Amino acid sequence: MAGQVVQYGRHRKRRNYARISEVLELPNLIEIQTKSYDWFLKEGLLEMFRDISPIEDFTGNLSLEFVDYRLGEPKYDLEESKNRDATYAAPLRVKVRLIIKETGEVKEQEVFMGDFPLMTDTGTFVINGAERVIVSQLVRSPSVYFNEKIDKNGRENYDATIIPNRGAWLEYETDAKDVVYVRIDRTRKLPLTVLLRALGFSNDQEIIDLLGDSEYLRNTLEKDGTENTEQALLEIYERLRPGEPPTVENAKSLLYSRFFDPKRYDLASVGRYKANKKLHLKHRLFNQRLAEPIVNSETGEIVAEEGTVLDRRKLDEIMEVLETNANSEVFELEGTVIDEPVEIQSIKVYVPNDEEGRTTTVIGNALPDSEVKCITPADIIASMSYFFNLLNGIGYTDDIDHLGNRRLRSVGELLQNQFRIGLSRMERVVRERMSIQDTDSITPQQLINIRPVIASIKEFFGSSQLSQFMDQANPLAELTHKRRLSALGPGGLTRERAQMEVRDVHYSHYGRMCPIETPEGPNIGLINSLSSYARVNEFGFIETPYRKVDLDTNSITDQIDYLTADEEDSYVVAQANSRLDENGRFLDDEVVCRFRGNNTVMAKEKMDYMDVSPKQVVSAATACIPFLENDDSNRALMGANMQRQAVPLMNTEAPFVGTGMEHVAARDSGAAITAKYRGRVEHVESKEILVRRLVEENGTEHEGELDRYPLAKFKRSNTGTCYNQRPIVSVGDVVEYNEILADGPSMELGEMALGRNVVVGFMTWDGYNYEDAVIMSERLVKDDVYTSIHIEEYESEARDTKLGPEEITRDIPNVSENALKNLDDRGIVYVGAEVKDGDILVGKVTPKGVTELTAEERLLHAIFGEKAREVRDTSLRVPHGAGGIVLDVKVFNREEGDDTLSPGVNQLVRVYIVQKRKIHVGDKMCGRHGNKGVISKIVPEEDMPYLPDGRPIDIMLNPLGVPSRMNIGQVLELHLGMAAKNLGIHVASPVFDGANDDDVWSTIEEAGMARDGKTVLYDGRTGEPFDNRISVGVMYMLKLAHMVDDKLHARSTGPYSLVTQQPLGGKAQFGGQRFGEMEVWALEAYGAAYTLQEILTYKSDDTVGRVKTYEAIVKGENISRPSVPESFRVLMKELQSLGLDVKVMDEQDNEIEMADVDDEDATERKVDLQQKDVPETQKETTD
């Protein structure tokens, strides 16, 4: 028997064909969300309050500090928040201290700063009752970047940019005359030496001594018109603030505020880390020949002689000295922006490949402390030095698409940035209030206005591009949405501007971002998914795990290191399927490995690391595709994306052929209920599970608290599918931490179950499976194999209007008693009623405008003091094409103290209608390999082809769909699935390490099937065998969310657009089918004049004619001639508005007055033309 049996969860065993043992458990797949939010609550918020404290007034007398904060208890729990359309949030209370320096008085107070949305255990937020996910954003990391570019003459040029987290950009570039320029904050360019002089290196010789002599520097000094620091400062001021009178003091404060003021310029910890890494000497001296010795500045000891070539070993030896103080110099600069001394490290090296033996100076920034979040003069000098070194061939340019230069902003950081915006707006208000209010009676509460803070948080959760309505179609869709990485959003790219390079797969994505799972269409490559083992480090860079190789023994150790993309560039990594002996040594002398972007073969002694698992390359969704290695990447992409669109079925079934990921994905998705502690199950019912904790103390186990786990029953998901949880544990079971207690939607026995295992034959049948169409047996309809449950929510609110309040009632004018049969005495439909489109769900009336009373009404009014009630029917009705059974009704009343109702609403009624949808012709189906199709025919069971034992098959697929698509995985799945069914087992074939040919064929033989996996099929209609043997097997097929019931649409009459009077378009507007210009050409070509005329008039915008036609049809009369279409009038008016005099003439050249035509038609046809001027954008017809 190939493979070994592995237990997945409590209830499922699978025969696993993997050959590589799992050395590392998969991490918690939604950790990227929860970890980031925890960081925000523990550190991010405090960091914000520290950054903004203290807020001082303009005189410096008052000072406001934010000391500490705490989160209170949420007003509503999670369930209640969803039911009430409220936000699941906790009150944020901040301890604020106000110091009055004149008197030394200190006032402390706790200030409420709004409700702060809380993250649920499953990584989502509940905002206004709806579950939302904050998607992580991929952005360019703050750092120093060097770029190579070719100018129009074909010469190599460089440019450099210092990009902060927030603040002014600093850019260097060269021109055709070899002069180096600097741009401050994207303004006009200045010679680079002007900025150096402004920093305090005032004369030419100082600059040459600092940066080393070079042709580029000489050219720049020639171009530079300034001679000392003061002139340079004035020159910069004139460039940045043209038109303002320059003074040295103003220039200093301007330069200070642009680069050295921590409130305005922020590299962030990640920017400091990247800048230190880039500008430090250790990476820049690699393989360079020294032109002067390296000296330990403290002891005076020479650690590397002149002429030494610094290879990796030598660099590692002197690293400690390099990192502390080798060749350091300190400059005391006067008359400049910053008074502090500037420390740098400078080492002369020989220019590579230079026959004259010229030298150049390499300057490092002496590693400022990680707390220094501003740029320092040392950084600017070191970056200039790097630029000149590049011109001499020392150093590297950066690849902007490398994941070492792109980082993730997860929930915590996105929230922090938004909170910072709110706090800085609040800071302005506080300053203003400090100067107005009386110092004696002032309190912190009076100074603080929390509105801007609340508004910025609300805005972020409610309308940011990165705050998305959770995709809740099935557990995999939830999981993938939480692990999504987007390059779009504020501060990111836009679809239109994103080049091919940004979207492309990059070698640094390996193990960090899935190369397969990304949307098709305009967002391809901009929205990605995190790989299965990847995690995010403190700086926001994605890391992937590798097994460490012991360099002495050349064996794989148990140590696992997580490496970022730029760390990995220094190492050689062997593949996960390299052959090892039992001691972890490589069996082959030559090993397939990766180094930077190259896949190559190297000697086993050169290996530094080895992959953890073959599936570390791909995301969770892609890892659910068995035989992924046999599919073409385009189809694998479709397979990964379509799994997310599978509709949860009524009867779920896990795949016979899985990958072993199904259990992990189901557990971490948040759709299942998992145990928070180890314990014993005490009570199980459909609505809740009770578990008694088992606590271990001093080696003995005793019972602890009782935990309640409520289950969701038949709730509506975000996508309108049924969200239902079922217990899978029994009383007395001992459950471990994080074990699944209850299945969610699309789950079976703790595994993801998106579709059903059905018997599939690859064959044609009367041409019904042309173009990927699917032919299906009626058994799948009868036995509810692909039946799904859908829940739709409808709501109606009674508001206060100018003419009086709306009323929910059963007493509706002009409605038959039959139409009210499903309503209770309140006028609301009862639970369990069966409703179809057009039926009333909630009876509601709205007061009409007051009309002039007749004499009789005035008399009645005088006698009874009340006129007849003037109301119009505004009831909530079932929309077209909908209907089903009323599942639940929720009523919210203002009188009963429901403060969650929005202003002006007195009552809110929500009605939930459930539909059971069987599978239909027109529904979309797919497998897991991107093999999708639409059902074209449902064939009676007795007519389906049947196997030699008499069993009819379930589905027929077109064999032509396989060769050109190159997704051979589906054929292997088909054979292995049949074998698994016959053997009564489930199998797991993990990606890139699954069942190979021999495994598949040996399992087929074990199951007693034919060696070629094919069989004779008999035609169900005639009983004759088909000519050739046919591949028949079991395939896992999914029903997708694109259902024909949602797409079918028909209209007789309906709403028209106000200006053109043409029917609206689209199902949502109950619109018509557009008859466009090409269709008109077709009718013209046929000469179908009358058909064309009625399409352009009655059926479109002949306002008079269409009313008349409807009338004629109802009365059974002949249809009269059409009148002028409205669009002709619109055209005339357009031309008149351009000042052109347009007249309509008859055959005798007499002018026709359009108004007369209207009136004539109207009087002749008894049509009221006044109804046209209804001031709404979309006007319903009254016909």
Curated annotation (Swiss-Prot):
Gene symbol of the encoding locus? rpoB
Output one GO BP term: DNA-templated transcription
Q: What is its EC number?
A: 2.7.7.6
Taxonomically, which superkingdom? Bacteria
Query: Could you tell me which InterPro entries the record lists for this protein?
Result: DNA-dir_RNA_pol_bsu_external_1, DNA-dir_RNA_pol_su2, DNA-dir_RNAP_su2_dom, DNA-dir_RNAP_su2_hyb_sf, RNA_pol_bsu_bac, RNA_pol_bsu_CS, RNA_pol_bsu_protrusion, RNA_pol_Rpb2_2
- For region Disordered, the annotated ranges are 1149-1183
What keywords sit in the KW lines? DNA-directed RNA polymerase, Nucleotidyltransferase, Transcription, Transferase
What is this protein identified as?
Answer: DNA-directed RNA polymerase subunit beta
PROSITE patterns, alphabetically?
RNA_POL_BETA (PS01166)
Entry-linked NCBIfam families: PRK00405.1 (NF001616), rpoB (TIGR02013)
Q: Which SUPFAM superfamilies does the UniProt entry name for this protein?
A: beta and beta-prime subunits of DNA dependent RNA-polymerase
